[in-house]
């Protein structure tokens, strides 16, 4: 009996979330910006671009699967009074962010915080590829000049665990979101 009530409650909760989500506007978007290395001494800032979708779960909560490609510039490294050039690198990231804030409603400006988890591949010429799990934490806002188009600016701290160490970046980006569905 207890198990039946738990299963029924779980199904009811999932149906509530699905029905709430189906009554909201979904979006797809693209973005571009800068990656600023925070702890790496062998890399300079580079460009990033990506794509994402936004799935509203509740009026204040949304799930955002995303794909990000980033390229980093190399940096000259000095060893024993001699300078050696270092190649830049590429990071490919696939993950999902959870957005908390004003995700629905008639407001023309939406503010939100975000946190997420992602899987990353780091490639650098002359080195073996590294993969690792990462997490993000950030904030952003979106301006909606029309009902179907949103202009967005966000900043994310992106930390990646690689081997015994890690990498950390500040990602600053701007993008466009196209909305479909009903409010």
What function would you assign to each model-found segment?
Residues 32-60:
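N-terminal targeting signals for Sec/Tat export/insertion, comprising classic cleavable signal peptides
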Residues 137-142:
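Short glycine-rich, acidic/polar surface loops and turns
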Residues 54-127, 132, 143-149, 172-183:
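Gram-negative (and chloroplast) outer-membrane scaffold detector with strong preference
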Residues 23-34, 111-113:
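Transmembrane beta-strand segments of Gram-negative outer membrane beta-barrel proteins
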Residues 38, 121-124, 159-161:
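Short, solvent-exposed loop/turn segments at secondary-structure junctions
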Residues 1-25, 181-183:
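Cleavable N-terminal export/targeting peptides
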Residues 23, 40-46, 85-93, 128-134, ...:
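Transmembrane beta-barrel outer-membrane domains
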């Amino acid at each position: 009996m207890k198990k039946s009530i738990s299963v029924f409650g779980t199904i009811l909760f999932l149906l509530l979330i699905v029905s709430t989500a189906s009554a909201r506007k979904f979006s797809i978007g693209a973005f571009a910006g800068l990656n600023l290395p925070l702890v790496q001494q062998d890399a300079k800032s580079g460009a990033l671009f990506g794509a994402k979708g936004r799935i509203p779960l509740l009026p204040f909560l949304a799930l955002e699967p995303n794909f990000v490609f980033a390229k980093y510039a190399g940096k000259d490294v000095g060893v024993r009074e001699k300078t050696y050039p270092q190649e830049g690198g590429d990071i490919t990231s696939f993950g999902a962010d959870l957005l908390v804030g004003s995700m629905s409603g008639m407001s023309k400006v939406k503010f939100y915080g975000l946190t997420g988890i992602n899987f990353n591949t780091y490639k650098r010429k002359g080195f073996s590829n590294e993969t690792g799990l990462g997490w993000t934490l950030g904030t952003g806002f979106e301006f909606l000049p029309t009902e179907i188009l949103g202009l967005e600016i966000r900043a994310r701290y992106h930390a990646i665990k690689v081997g015994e160490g890690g990498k950390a970046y500040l990602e600053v980006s701007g993008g466009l979101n196209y909305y479909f569905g009903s409010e």
